[in-house]
């Protein structure tokens, strides 16, 4: 049933791996109490917010027990779309989030017809103030309980920092970092209280090195890595899995349509579907970092050996805009 509801090429990659991800083992807290800071937030904390701020009216409340779901942001393209295809194997209900209703409806139709899964569609632009509050309210109004949270929404662009607009920098940080943090804050307490759940935060190998001419984007991915590492340790005792996905370049139609298709770099890219398989498997195993692909692993390894000034110089030489 269908109901209405990264990043640049450098952000996504894949891993040589066979098989499909298994279902994450559910760990339980037993008699261990949940700290006060992890208690569930007030479900009606923002009654004054307009219902249609994100582009759709809140779904009508449902009766009965909450429906467990996997919520995927940035669901309509690249890694996000492939993650949806993987998650339907272990989740009967998907909540997909994106900016384009048309693309979301197309994806929902595809998933529901191919996998016989219940798909809920939510339109939201995370760069807009208050968008997360409205999304969370809509999800709860639909009687959905987020069992797996996938923070995949994000974007980036290349330009000298001093020459780029502050408004665009703010939108990048809001989308890549603040929205991710707010969604974790909204749903992690419920997961901890239940004693199970999973959070997959999509970072990038870009977060391991400085990124001249893409400084804010690289820094935003470093935040995702650091934040996920801390969250991993805090939520692990409560049975909640946390994984930071740190891919490198992903294979896109560009490689098939351009002369670059047979270059060495093109051969090092991997498909988004293989990235998704690696990510879901890592989350099931509660691995903190997932860096799929040869190139991604090489970048991560090299970042630990090379001085940061050297790494910054190398990134600058690759990313400096041509005049």
Whereabouts are the PLM-identified features?
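Active-site helix of classical SDR
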Residues: 184, 220
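Rossmann-fold cofactor-recognition segment
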Residues: 113-129
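Substrate-binding pocket helix/loop in short-chain dehydrogenase/reductase
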Residues: 160-161, 168-171
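Residue(s) in the substrate-gating loop at a strand-loop-helix junction
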Residues: 204
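C-terminal helical subdomain
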Residues: 244, 264-299
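Conserved glycine-rich cofactor-binding loop
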Residues: 76-77
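Conserved glycine-rich Rossmann-like NAD(P)H-binding loop of the short-chain dehydrogenase/reductase
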Residues: 91-106
């Amino acid at each position: 049933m269908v109901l209405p509801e990264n990043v640049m090429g450098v952000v996504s990659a894949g891993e040589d791996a066979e098989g499909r991800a298994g279902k994450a083992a559910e760990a339980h807290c037993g008699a261990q109490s949940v700290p006060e800071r992890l208690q569930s937030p007030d479900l009606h904390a923002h009654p004054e917010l307009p219902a249609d701020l994100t582009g759709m009216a809140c779904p009508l409340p449902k009766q009965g027990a909450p429906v467990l779901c996997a919520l995927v942001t940035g669901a309509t393209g690249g890694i996000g779309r492939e993650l949806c295809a993987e998650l339907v194997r272990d989740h009967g209900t998907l909540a997909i989030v994106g900016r384009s209703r048309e693309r979301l409806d197309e994806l929902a139709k595809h998933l529901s017809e191919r996998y016989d899964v219940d798909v809920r569609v939510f339109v939201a632009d995370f760069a807009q103030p208050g968008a997360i509050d409205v999304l969370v309210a809509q999800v709860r109004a639909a009687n959905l309980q987020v069992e797996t949270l996938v923070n995949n929404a994000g974007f980036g662009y290349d330009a000298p920092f001093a020459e780029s607009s502050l408004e665009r920098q703010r939108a990048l940080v809001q989308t890549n970092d603040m929205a991710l943090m707010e969604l974790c804050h909204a749903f992690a307490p419920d997961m901890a209280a239940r004693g199970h759940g999973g959070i997959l935060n999509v970072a990038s190998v870009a977060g391991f090195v400085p990124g001249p001419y893409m400084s804010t984007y690289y820094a935003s991915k470093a935040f995702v890595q650091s934040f996920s590492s801390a969250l991993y340790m805090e939520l692990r005792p409560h049975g909640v899995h946390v994984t930071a996905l740190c891919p490198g370049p992903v294979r896109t139609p560009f490689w098939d349509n351009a002369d670059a298709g047979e270059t060495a770099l093109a051969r090092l890219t991997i498909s988004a579907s293989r990235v998704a398989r690696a990510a879901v498997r890592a989350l099931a195993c509660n691995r903190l970092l997932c860096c799929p692909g040869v190139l991604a692993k090489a970048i991560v390894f090299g970042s630990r050996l090379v001085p940061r000034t050297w790494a910054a110089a190398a990134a600058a030489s690759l990313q400096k805009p041509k005049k």
